[in-house]
């Protein structure tokens, strides 16, 4: 029987162990998509308790606690103490066997705090106190956590109207780790509620200095902000979409649709789809002009629980995997940009694993030989960033594309304790490749190439691809 989470955790063969310990483990982290709060980095925030850094905003844990019968007040309530919340989480952990939360929890305790104990109700108080004692030390600040995990670059997720003041403050402080913004313009496409769209346009107008009264005005304002993001080091955009939008439209139609929604009138479903289609093209062209990488996270159905959405708002654990037929629209969107000669580097992330092979084959349609892996299949995302999900993504990419050109892992997380997800990914990658070598599916005489492949996927490919 193997020990739980020892140095060879998830590494089933001697080759896998060598690949990880001699190659993957030493590579710095490039976290090119995350949801860290930039102000915490700028201010070098000192966390008040393990509950704050671990449970605050973590909808993965909240979902598990609710499923385990824990009352909402211990997840998101304001009338419970940090210890009471943590105690309920500790009671839930033993019920998470085979859920990635169990592995993540113990990897984070081990790598951040040097704790090898299993978390359960018996050990909860001891672990809580020990972690809180360490969190009070300067080396456990927000920046300290990033240093601890050998992070080199992080890319946060930012709205076009954001001031980026904390990115600027962080850079000017001389902090050695790069924190770069990512352009996330979802609200500029959100025309379902006219009042919300109008309010956002007013914010965009104020921050850009462009008076907005037409579609062209809006695009001009967005371009000014796009330029500003570029000045602050931005190299990626990100789009959270249910599905791809590729409706046919005319400029006259889009102008009329803008005027209608800006004037406060609800749009038809057809008008909404046409507007979103136009905006994706506009954003794709902007990114191409600057040589950015565009990312698309698609396939989630969000805020499914109306009662809890009204109570807690978005991103609180009430989203799930959607089921959309989107291959034709995806191809049409990419083809339009490609035909115009304006298809920039692209990463496609699906939330439904049924689309793994769809994406893996879509990539090859638009690779043009200018950049290795120009169109990328993004790492397993959200519900899929666990061992099984990552293996399936890498297997599909291996079978239908080039795994060796993959830009690798990202946390997509709000937590400064999520960096062990890179280790989890690296161990999974090394186990896959190590098993293939041991099984004679990759020749042992090519082990140096395999070594290089591991280092490339863990770090080098992303470094070159994003030009950090």
UniProtKB/Swiss-Prot annotation:
Keyword Isomerase belongs to the record: yes
Species per Swiss-Prot/TrEMBL record: Phocaeicola vulgatus (strain ATCC 8482 / DSM 1447 / JCM 5826 / CCUG 4940 / NBRC 14291 / NCTC 11154) (Bacteroides vulgatus)
GO biological process: D-galacturonate catabolic process; D-glucuronate catabolic process
Pathway membership: Carbohydrate metabolism; pentose and glucuronate interconversion
Keywords: Isomerase
Keyword Chloroplast in annotation: no
Pfam families: UxaC
Gene that this polypeptide is encoded by: uxaC
Identification of the protein by name: Uronate isomerase
Catalytic activity from the UniProt record: D-glucuronate = D-fructuronate; aldehydo-D-galacturonate = keto-D-tagaturonate
UniProt family annotation: Belongs to the metallo-dependent hydrolases superfamily. Uronate isomerase family.
An annotated Gene Ontology molecular function: glucuronate isomerase activity
Gene3D superfamilies in the record: Metal-dependent hydrolases (3.20.20.140), uronate isomerase, domain 2, chain A (1.10.2020.10)
NCBIfam families found in the cross-reference section: PRK02925.1
EC number: 5.3.1.12
Entry-linked InterPro entries: Metal_Hydrolase, Uronate_isomerase
């Amino acid at each position: 029987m193997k020990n739980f989470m020892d140095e060879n955790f998830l590494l089933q063969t001697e080759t896998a162990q060598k690949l990880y310990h001699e190659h993957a483990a030493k590579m710095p982290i490039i976290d090119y998509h995350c949801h860290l709060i930039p102000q915490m980095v700028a201010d070098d925030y000192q966390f008040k308790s393990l509950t704050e850094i671990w449970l605050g905003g973590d909808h993965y844990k909240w979902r598990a606690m609710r499923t385990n019968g824990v009352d909402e007040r211990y997840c998101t309530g304001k009338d419970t103490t940090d210890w009471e919340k943590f105690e309920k989480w500790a009671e839930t952990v033993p019920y998470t066997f085979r859920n990635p939360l169990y592995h993540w929890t113990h990897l984070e305790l081990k790598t951040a705090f040097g704790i090898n104990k299993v978390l359960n109700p018996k050990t909860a108080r001891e672990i809580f106190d020990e972690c809180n004692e360490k969190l009070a030390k300067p080396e456990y600040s927000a920046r300290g956590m990033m240093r601890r995990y050998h992070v080199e670059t992080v890319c946060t997720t930012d709205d076009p109207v954001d001031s980026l003041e904390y990115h600027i403050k962080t850079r000017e402080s001389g902090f050695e780790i790069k924190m770069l913004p990512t352009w996330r313009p979802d609200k500029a496409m959100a025309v379902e509620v006219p009042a919300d769209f109008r309010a956002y346009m007013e914010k965009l107008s104020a921050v850009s200095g462009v008076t907005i009264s037409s579609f062209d005005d809006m695009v001009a304002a967005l371009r000014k902000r796009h330029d500003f993001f570029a000045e602050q080091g931005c190299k990626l955009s990100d789009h959270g979409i249910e599905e791809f939008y590729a409706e046919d439209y005319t400029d006259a139609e889009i102008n009329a649709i803008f005027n209608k929604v800006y004037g406060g009138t609800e749009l038809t479903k057809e008008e909404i789809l046409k507007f979103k289609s136009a905006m994706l093209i506009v954003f794709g062209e902007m990114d191409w002009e600057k040589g950015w990488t565009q990312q698309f996270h698609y396939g989630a159905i969000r805020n499914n629980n109306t009662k809890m959405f009204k109570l807690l708002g978005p991103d609180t654990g009430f989203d799930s995997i959607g089921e959309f037929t989107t291959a034709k629209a995806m191809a049409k969107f990419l083809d339009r940009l490609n035909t115009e000669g304006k298809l920039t580097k692209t990463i496609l992330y699906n939330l439904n694993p049924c689309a793994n092979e769809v994406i893996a084959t879509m990539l090859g349609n638009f690779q043009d030989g200018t950049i290795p892996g120009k169109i990328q299949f993004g790492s397993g995302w959200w519900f899929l960033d666990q061992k099984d999900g990552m293996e399936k993504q890498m297997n599909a990419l291996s079978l239908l594309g080039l795994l060796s050109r993959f830009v690798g892992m990202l946390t997509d997380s709000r937590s400064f304790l999520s960096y062990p997800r890179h280790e989890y990914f690296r161990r999974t990658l090394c186990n896959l490749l190590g098993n293939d070598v041991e099984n004679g599916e990759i020749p042992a005489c090519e082990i140096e190439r395999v070594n290089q492949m591991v280092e490339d996927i863990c770090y080098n490919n992303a470094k070159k691809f994003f030009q950090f």
